[in-house]
């Protein structure tokens, strides 16, 4: 995701309260779950976008940086890969 898009997401986040963004994120997660349950690929893609946007906004409201998320993603991937190798 490029900086221009992140800046737009963050600018919108700054308008709303933390509680509002938390609530919106939960709503979007429910919509994503519904899209997955119905195997509606186009709707699922749209809902993925909504979830990603609102999650980035929640990170901002919590004063967490996206690079902190990157570190957690790396950790989780490493852990999963180690687990998979140990099952071979």
Residue ranges of model-derived segments:
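Flexible "arm" and connector segments at domain edges
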Residues: 1-88
